[in-house]
Amino acid sequence: MSKIQIEQLSKRFVKRDKYIEALKDITLTIKQGEFVCLLGPSGCGKTTLLRILANLEKPSTGDVIINQTDKKKPLQSMVFQENGVIPWLTVEENVAFGLKMRHLSNDFVKERTEYYLQKVGLSKFRRLYPKELSGGMKQRVSIARAFANDPEILLMDEPFAALDEQNKFILQEELLAIWQETRKTVLFITHSIDEALLLSDRILLMSAQPGKIIKDVAIEMNRPRSIEKVRSDPEMTKIFLDIWEQLQSEVKQTRLK
Amino acid sequence: MSKIQIEQLSKRFVKRDKYIEALKDITLTIKQGEFVCLLGPSGCGKTTLLRILANLEKPSTGDVIINQTDKKKPLQSMVFQENGVIPWLTVEENVAFGLKMRHLSNDFVKERTEYYLQKVGLSKFRRLYPKELSGGMKQRVSIARAFANDPEILLMDEPFAALDEQNKFILQEELLAIWQETRKTVLFITHSIDEALLLSDRILLMSAQPGKIIKDVAIEMNRPRSIEKVRSDPEMTKIFLDIWEQLQSEVKQTRLK
Amino acid sequence: QSSESDENDNAKSTDPLAPLEETAKVVIAEDGSASGAGFYIAKDKGYFEKYNIEVEFATFGNSDEMLPAVAAGEVDVAGGISSASFFNSIAQGIDVRFIADKGHNNEGSSYFTFVVREDLKDDITDYEDVKGKKIAVSTQNAVDHYIYNEMLKHANVSTEEVEFVLMSDFGNMMSAMGNQQIDLALQIEPLITQGENQAIHQRFLDATDYAPEAQIAMVLGSPKFLTERRDVAVRFMAAYLQGVRDYHDVFIKDIDDNGEVISIMANHTALKDEDLWKEVGVTGLNPNGYIFEDDVEKQYQFYKENGAIQGELDFDTIIDMSLVEEALDIIGTYEE
Amino acid sequence: MFKKLKTQSLPQLITISSPIFLLLLWEICSQYALLDPRFFPAPTLILTTLIQMAESGNLFEHIYISLTRIILGFALGVIPAICIGLLMGMYKYFRHFFSPIIMIFMPIPTLAMLPIILILFGIGEFSKMITIAISVFFPVAINTAAGVANIDRIYLDVAKNYHANAKDFFFKIALPGSLPVMLEGIQMGQAIALLTIVAAEMIGATSGIGYLIWMNYKAFLLPQMYVGLILISFFGYFFSLLLRGFERKLLPWK
Amino acid sequence: MFKKLKTQSLPQLITISSPIFLLLLWEICSQYALLDPRFFPAPTLILTTLIQMAESGNLFEHIYISLTRIILGFALGVIPAICIGLLMGMYKYFRHFFSPIIMIFMPIPTLAMLPIILILFGIGEFSKMITIAISVFFPVAINTAAGVANIDRIYLDVAKNYHANAKDFFFKIALPGSLPVMLEGIQMGQAIALLTIVAAEMIGATSGIGYLIWMNYKAFLLPQMYVGLILISFFGYFFSLLLRGFERKLLPWK
Ligand SMILES: Nc1ncnc2c1ncn2[C@@H]1O[C@H](COP(=O)(O)OP(=O)(O)OP(=O)(O)O)[C@@H](O)[C@H]1O
Ligand SMILES: Nc1ncnc2c1ncn2[C@@H]1O[C@H](COP(=O)(O)OP(=O)(O)OP(=O)(O)O)[C@@H](O)[C@H]1O
Ligand SMILES: [Mg+2]
Ligand SMILES: [Mg+2]
């Protein structure tokens, strides 16, 4: 069953008298429960695509359809790159933010918040403000907030880019654990091929500006995965080198312009 | 010939009435022309060690000796993690900063600056201010500034941490190219094992707080290296997994505390 | 001190009014009011210049603000009113003196008198009507307050039966009238005439009814000016009195001078409309310079009773007519 | 740039000693008439005067009255300033409408506004509060608008992404997000309120600290005038500290 | 939050129309005596007065004199403020010494300072400039100190790492790094300089815009007073723009 359907989508920005063609002719179907990673050179329009799905930006042409199965659930929730955690709300209030905005019953909000605080291991820090948290903890808050909102799809824009490699891996494991439980449809942007290999069912590779989907690779490795397994698997190394090469050539193309 | 000699170094910080033991009993020798990567969990004291070498911090006990071979050259120059580029100076002025501070002749400053601007491919952008540069370009300025100063040793504190993976690799290649030409002694901090494998002659692994050197691995792969080669080499994969495991256990130890 | 200066003067009396050998500068503090007529006329008609005196005006918000400047020797001469602060500063050792008249009310056409709000002019017609009214006065424990007090005494109304409103500025009284915040005000020319023309207020009887000899403003001299620069001071006073006499000729004796004095007045004060000068109640200025000494002493007693005076002072040193007398010796007494 | 334990009390020592040093200098200069003591009475004399005035009792009345005017006038300026500032920050048409008006009125000195205030608001307590309110209004309105405008775009996106309605957006994002810059404006407004009290108490006042200052100046009772100045200075310091404390309470997340 | 091409002229339209709207409202209210025209003369009347005053010639003299006082007074306040502010920002002992003094003197109203200024500096041009200088001093000094203190530590480390000497440190790091915040303070100082001109021209002035305002008010020549107010407002706006332009030149890196 297709959850997200994108057809002939394109997006142009007007900057003074100049047009910037950010996305061009994107056609794409994502199935219910799929974890999809979007890879591409910087400035190719990944964020733009996600923002269109999140209804924060309007497409210039084409259609985006998200299949709603439960009218009571919100369509989508987004995990932002960094700083997405609101600094004047405590950890608890941040996690409860989406639920509060939907004006759900207090008990329900409390119970959900509690549950996801537990999940990301922040119960002890519920009363702290974001300034007192490390980068990794902040992203945990962001993830908990999105999951607590229980949306139909989850959109994540490089949530771990600002973390160091070791912390990144811990959070990846945690994300996978929560995801495995809920089996939400996830669209995840990253620059890291290793991250994509570890997390996704499917990797979409975008071209340099204007962004088009130029490669669609299914990752069939068994779950649960780990860095060790990914690294030791020769099949995975092959996929890595393959994507690497293609990405490198796209990046170089951008630099020549 | 040993270039850097560290003996029984330890460093304590006073924070109100509490002592923080950042470094403990570090003894270490780095040879002339060696490229050494320092790996370790967050907060283990890597930056502190570098700052002591850079004379920005005093050790609590122990000695640090940097072997000076040329009295006219500065002892060390540092490449900072990010934001190390001074925003009110142009690209050119930033690269010339170290030379200007040493009040060298204008012609010489100009020639050196020109040379390194060329090296990092920023000649066209010389008159721009840092705000107009991308993250990668800023780090190029930072690297050019350090090399232009022509110090005995180079200290780099996660210079590529804030860059995306593709840009990171491009800069790594550029760094290696410049380094191969000058053969400076480099001490390079990173969180990325891949980065360490690609760049270094030797990887030092630090323990969680208080920081001690717990592993010293020589990387004997031939140069010039590339990601593809590193990834395809089973020996390298072995070293990766080895360090990964040890690092992971150090990181987990930090989390338990 | 005055005897000393007499001696000084005698020594030079061979040619008392020759111009000074070197141009002397005299700084006069003013607040831009019409009572400075003597200064303005003497300057513009060249009486000061005749004695080789160069005068410069410095304008202040009100006479109290001039005192520190006089005391500090920043200005030589100031126009001031008698007020508690004046007496207090003398008690503090600031040796300023009253040296000549600079304003009293002319009978029946006072330049400093009460006005009543336009819409109340039919209700408040006589003194007893002020009972229960709001009356604006521009200073506390100064001549305004004294005249206010005299008016109430004359009206047989106690201070508790009216509301005293302190208002720092005569302009503010106009605004407060327009806004019906006050009923009466102790106002000054040319604002009295201006307010009448703009239907803001009307004259309320006349201050000479109850304070005929009120000494409203005086010329103040700085101690340095009066002693160390005596020869300048004498010439200054002579020139000043000549200016005052021209003023008196025009406004009191109605001698026509082709509008010269009026144009000087219009030039130096805020009342630019020369025709209006024929309407206003002009400031009374004694052409012989003398002041109502008894009234000044009465005012002093009034402030003292109000507890506004700190310390005792010798009244004789405050009013110093020696300069006027010296000048009169030379230029002669003006005959009415 | 190095901090040692034993030197940590030195800064405090300097901080305390500098006003004391100044006072001592003044005292000596005044006692030995290096400064004219008629105009600069010695601090000890001022202190004696202060005590006398406090004992006679009506000093506290002056303080009470001025503080009432300052606090109410401050509130009267701050509340509309915050409302208009928020509207300006949130809706660009409001911003475009109000900013030229603010630009025009801001440079007009309070002293020059007095006649107009008097005409419009009379001479009662209200006009004094309005005087203070007007002078407080501008910095607070400007800072509030700047505060809203400077909220990081990402929080607006978060709010939108989680379907915050207008009310929630206002109370959960716009208001708390603009608070830090707004409080800077309020801190400035507080300073200005104190600076304005003398001007405000020039319209038909018969009491208050401002009245104390200029009345005593007019009466040439300088020690009493200095008492007034010291009171203003003290309350300036006190309010600053108070607002700083308030700020820390209000912005636990900063 | 969406921007379309055709709407881009609307904000400008609003910005221009709001003062015009206000003027029209005033004109109508004044013409039909909804506002007392004796106290609020119609804008057209004020304009006529302005033209008359300009033709008679001495309006420009008033402007010239006030601008000279404002600019020199401003410079007289800003220069020491920057020096002390920089010292306070760079050396903590200076900071600890000066900050209580600044805290004490800042809340004292200019109006209350006038007598002291008069005694110390007389009644000449200099005392007027000093009045302005004092009021300008505080915000500039405070902002300069804050500017230096807020320079990102990493630039200090960079300077140290590259062995900058004291002079280079000052000119390459401390000064340019503190400039943005310092300029904010200067912008504030400029606003305050204009606000202070009326007070400054109350001591012994015989000309100037401030003098024009309060002299004409004393004489109850309100249209002339409003001309003065309009001039102040105009110059406030003008100086703001000037400083903004200057800022853009001085901070190309912002
Ligand atoms: N609001 C906007 N106005 C104008 N141009 C925009 C806007 N948002 C994005 N762009 C442009 O659209 C292109 C795609 O931007 P986008 O942020 O989607 O790239 P990205 O793939 O997310 O890059 P990165 O990997 O660096 O995050 C870029 O050239 C960018 O400059
Ligand atoms: N100036 C200081 N005062 C007090 N404690 C400090 C100071 N600088 C560092 N520390 C402490 O010393 C320890 C080591 O810090 P350091 O910055 O060297 O770690 P790091 O290895 O560079 O970490 P990261 O990988 O996150 O950069 C940390 O616990 C830190 O809190
Ligand atoms: Mg992006
Ligand atoms: Mg570090």
Where do the protein language model's features map onto the residues?
Chain A
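The feature captures the beta-strand-to-loop junction immediately N-terminal to the Walker
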Residues: 39-41
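Conserved signature/switch motifs of ABC ATPase nucleotide-binding domains
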Residues: 128-131, 149
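Short helical segment in ABC ATPase nucleotide-binding domains corresponding to the A-loop/adjacent helical element
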Residues: 92-100, 110, 114, 218
